[in-house]
Amino acid sequence: MREQSVKRQAAVLACANGAVRALGFLLHVVLGRMLGAEALGVFELAHSAHMLAVTPVTAGLPTAVSRLTARREDGAALTAGRGLAMRAGLGLMLLWLALSPLIAGLLGDPRTLPALWVSAPCVLLSGLAAVYHGYCYGQGRPWPPAWATLTEQAARFLLCAPLLIPGLTVAGRAAIPGAAETLGEAAALGLLLLLLRRCLPGRLPRDKGLEKELLLLSLPLTGTRLIQTASRALVSGLLPRRLVAAGMPPTQATAAVGLLHGMVLPVIFLPGILTVAIGMAGIPALARREGPALRRMAGQLFAASLGCGLLGWAAIHGLSGFLANTIYRQPALRGLFRAAAPLTLLFALGQAAATLLSGLGQQKKTLLPTLVGTALLLILTYRWAASPLRLYGAITALLVSRAVSVLWELAAALPLLTPSAAPAAPSDD
């Protein structure tokens, strides 16, 4: 297997993630101006629900493929993962198309229906691409996923403007980003297959035992991500209703969701450029190590994530005025950016804990903290978003709930750094 250092892989992935996030950030700015806050809010409602269908095939399975590929020299993990992603992705895509009218009703806004329909193929496309990404990370090949991800984001950016036909309704404008995402995912998967055509394993017989092992490894992380995604969908549907209860007009409440989820939170997630790259390179690296080398690697990964979180917090707080006034041209966003800035540190620490637990095959320990944090988020959003705090109440709910789940995860992860607690990496026997 062609091996690269963890630092080199993380650097490649960080550069790719940086370019992707930069394009994504620019896309959100353009969409905010091009679609309008109300259409952006409708899109965010639909997208939060759409992620529920994508998460089962993009969350735990790629990590499991990466971990098993790092321990094996053949391509059996890719073959098994690809088969699982194909079957699950196709079934979920068809189910999503059939249930979209019901989901639009549950979201409380029928204008989300076109956006739900046009993004349905992403379920299958994203699942297949994610498995190939996991295979590449396990083999120490970060470049193919990096180029594919860049292609997907660039295609989304370039296609949004041509797809925006003059005279579209709010529902039609809200469907534009989803259509561009589907086309971008198709282009990215095609490029990925082209780049990997010479290094993919030959046709292998179906290995049900390996498929079962992949499922067992992926289920805890998939469950955790599903809970997180479901919480975002529920909060996206709950927040405008609670803002209306606080006295805000319905159209203004929908626009407020666009401000928070379409403008503020994408900036808060920007430091994830580095922490996600550290995690993607770190999981297979941890799976290959044991003893002192394992503990040393875990400590380095955790320290790097902590530094990224602190720097991100400081940067967003310091640049809040520039982001609000110059980038988004929404002066009211300055206070929201400052209030939400601590989330960057919490997300970085959560990523570090998840990386350590996933690398050691103990990702199930993230499930209960995530469940408790999600329940707390819904309760606090229900109460505080309807108070005079409004959007600031929703941000405070995010901070408190995330802090609880992250501290819980750290309590499970940090003891694994001690010599007596750190388990050895599983062998291939």
Go through each PLM region and give its residues.
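N-terminal membrane topogenesis motif
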Residues: 1-23, 79, 208-228, 412-413, ...
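Signature of the first transmembrane helix
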Residues: 5-62, 93-97, 122, 219-242, ...
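Alpha-helical transmembrane segments of multi-pass membrane transporters/permeases
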Residues: 10-20, 116-117, 121, 136-161, ...
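Residue-level signature of transmembrane alpha-helical cores of multipass secondary-active transporters
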Residues: 13-17, 51, 85, 119, ...
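Helix-loop junctions and terminal segments of transmembrane helices
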Residues: 58-73, 268-292
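Membrane-water interface segments that mark the loop-to-transmembrane alpha-helix transition
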Residues: 59-101, 114, 292-312
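Short membrane-interface helical motifs at transmembrane helix boundaries
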Residues: 91-114, 310-330, 334, 339
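Hydrophobic alpha-helical transmembrane segments
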Residues: 147-162, 169-199, 373-376, 391-415
